[in-house]
Amino acid sequence: RDAQAEVQMTNAGVQLAGGSALCRHRPQQSIKRLVIRGRGIQLNDESVSSSLGLRPDGVFQIAGCGRSSFTPRQAVLTLESSSSQPRSGGIGTLQFVEEFTPSVYFNPFSGSPGQYPDEFIPNFDAISESVDGYD
């Protein structure tokens, strides 16, 4: 583990939300009780295993996580490249589309191509009011 990198990431606001489960078996009872301890998991917490599914490329795998291909130093560099300052004011339409439109949806609206906002369709032809590849 790279404790220095984990401290830097924690100080930058990286945190795993949620709690951990603790299963206690009491001999006098025949039922196992599941006790949930609700607290956030900080990266520089000594109880955190390096096998957690935290990756700086935005992928967080909850179940069956394998070993990350990122070293702690690479993770810090990747996370530090993004802005840590909160955004103030509004954002433009194009920036909103780039950041918040799911990439799985090619066209998030239904209807004729003339009704789509131009920002959602990279191959929209404003002159013919058609989308390349559609009949």
From Swiss-Prot:
Any Gene Ontology CC annotation: viral capsid
Record GO terms (molecular function): hexon binding
InterPro entries: Adeno_PVIII
Prodomain residues: 1-19
Entry-linked Pfam families: Adeno_PVIII
Annotated positions for site Cleavage: G19, S20
Family that this chain belongs to: Belongs to the adenoviridae pVIII family.
Name of the molecule in the record: Hexon-associated protein
Organism: Human adenovirus B serotype 3 (HAdV-3)
